[in-house]
Amino acid sequence: MAMVASPDDIVKSPLPPPPPPPPPPLPPAHKDKAAYNPYSGCPAHGGDDGLDGIVLVLRAAAALLALVAMALVASCRHGDWMEFTRYQEYRYLLGVAVVASLYSALQAARTFRRMRAGTAYAATFLDFAGDQAVGYLLITASSAALPITIRMRSAVVNTFTDVVAASISFAFLAFAALAFSALIAGFRLSSSSSSAYNY
């Protein structure tokens, strides 16, 4: 005769624990690509990549050097043939030095304001082209004034020729500062374009 187990004899096994809830979905990777515009600058990715200070120093140095070159040329008013206004090369050098000083000072102030605001510098085509254009003016002005200065100094060396030679040297140094600034702007512009369009 079969034995039927009573309910009390049945050992109730515990229920298995419920499965853990699924982890929350990961947020999508953040990419600053939509706002990129090469003519107005790419969006800042936050922080300073170490080049902002170099750009500021280069542009401030270019402004100061061009200002010194301008002051030196303008001071060459010694009468007779020692008047810078008698030579179109020196008038051109003076005009270019004024333009370079104003441009570099405005760009330095713009960079400094961005650094104070905590905004990462975004290179633009205008920065790149502006540095190249003003640098080209400086090197052409220096090259135009150099031959006539060499001819003068081969005949006579005085305060006029010394000051003009110093002005040419400062203009060339201002060109070098803007040339390095243009290199940095081109590098950062290329890097920003690559990161913005590299999916």
Curated annotation (Swiss-Prot):
Compartmental location: Cell membrane
Annotated transmembrane regions: 54-74, 92-112, 128-148, 164-184
Compositionally skewed regions (Pro residues) per UniProt: 14-28
Cytoplasmic topology ranges: 1-53, 113-127, 185-199
Membrane topology designation: Multi-pass membrane protein
Extracellular face of the membrane: 75-91, 149-163
Top-rank lineage group of the source organism: Eukaryota
One GO cellular component, as annotated: plasma membrane
Keyword Transmembrane helix: yes
Any one Pfam family match given in the protein's UniProt record, by short name: CASP_dom
InterPro entries, per the entry: CASP_dom
Region (Disordered) residue spans: 1-32
S-adenosyl-L-methionine as UniProt keyword: no
Keywords: Cell membrane, Membrane, Transmembrane, Transmembrane helix
UniProt-listed PANTHER family: CASP-LIKE PROTEIN 4A4 (PTHR33573), CASP-LIKE PROTEIN 4B1 (PTHR33573:SF36)
Similarity remark: Belongs to the Casparian strip membrane proteins (CASP) family.
Assembly with partners or alone: Homodimer and heterodimers.
Protein name: CASP-like protein 4B1
Organism of derivation: Oryza sativa subsp. japonica (Rice)
